[in-house]
């Protein structure tokens, strides 16, 4: 009998937290970033965002 490998269920909907640090509050979901606001501030320049003021 052949072995059947089961794959984990795919999650749909919101991601549970920041993909960088795991923090649950202050998530920036716009443009599919899924970063908390602190991680967003640290990595915004590298992501291509510019501060105008």
Curated annotation (Swiss-Prot):
GO molecular function, one term: zinc ion binding
Cofactor descriptive note: Binds 1 zinc ion per subunit.
Cellular component GO terms, alphabetical: cytosolic small ribosomal subunit
Keyword Metal-binding: yes
Keywords for the protein's UniProt record, in alphabetical order: Metal-binding, Ribonucleoprotein, Ribosomal protein, RNA-binding, rRNA-binding, Zinc
Record-listed Zn(2+) binding positions: 18, 21, 36, 39
Required cofactor(s): Zn(2+)
InterPro entries: Ribosomal_uS14, Ribosomal_uS14_arc, Ribosomal_uS14_CS, RIbosomal_uS14_euk_arc, Ribosomal_uS14_sf
Alphabetical list of NCBIfam families matching this protein: PRK05766.1 (NF004424)
Task of the protein: Binds 16S rRNA, required for the assembly of 30S particles.
Quaternary structure note: Part of the 30S ribosomal subunit.
Similarity comment: family membership: Belongs to the universal ribosomal protein uS14 family. Zinc-binding uS14 subfamily.
Protein name, UniProt field: Small ribosomal subunit protein uS14
Name of the gene this protein is made from: rps14
